[in-house]
Amino acid sequence: MKAKHRRTLEAIFSMPARGAIVFSDIEGLIRALGGEVREGEGSRFVFELKGSRKYLHRPHPRKEARKYQVEELREWFDKLEVRP
């Protein structure tokens, strides 16, 4: 895993949740972990990792993920045993 992806993962697990994580960095992290990122209708995205799916909407007009999305990702990664 590249240092950029490691920093993104550490930011997701930081407490309290940060709302300054760029959504495209999250997409890159999922791909670096061997997952798949698919864009659905509108701004909906499907993240697939280790046989599990997570649905999120790309924030707009901002490019940063919202805090609740970061918290959901943290819980999903924790369930999949993906940790920094």
Predicted regions and their residues:
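Basic nucleic-acid-binding interfaces
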Residues: 1-84
